[in-house]
Amino acid sequence: MTTELADAESRLSGVGLRVTAPRRAVIAAIGALEGPFTIEELTAAAPGVGRATVFRTVKLLQEAELVCRMVLEDGGVRYEASAGGHHHHLICSVCGGVTEFSDPALDLLIQENANLNGFQLAGHSLELYGRCAECTHRAG
């Protein structure tokens, strides 16, 4: 068992969730996929686990902060393992590449704005769209 798989199972157990065989299969499939994935790609990578079970498991993994959800510029949704904790995304509109970044000052600014407006923040997601350095260079 990989360290990441063991950590994911431990975190699920730690928040009171059972680690069933289908959940274990989904976690293993996430570990085998490279980069962001769709529910369909994850379902294909977890043979024998139904789409509804994959979807529910991904939702639980999001709540346990083990998976991060991204909304792409075209409205499509992709997910990724998020063992590194909370982060944001720069998404290239040309090649579809995703770059993760963390900025505690930005997170503090978001929290301060929520507080100023009397808003109790439960969480946030930030995706920035544009052109990556490589695509910008290729475009001249």
Which role does the model predict for each range below?
Residues V54-E65:
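Basic amphipathic alpha-helical segments that dock to polyanions
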Residues A21, L33-T38:
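Short capping segments at the starts of secondary-structure elements
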Residues E63-G140:
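Non-DNA-binding regulatory cores of transcription-related proteins
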Residues R24-A29:
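Pre-recognition alpha-helix immediately N-terminal to the DNA-recognition helix
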Residues E41-A45:
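A short acidic, leucine-rich amphipathic alpha-helix
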Residues T2-G16:
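Short, Lys/Arg-enriched N-terminal segment that forms or immediately precedes the first helix
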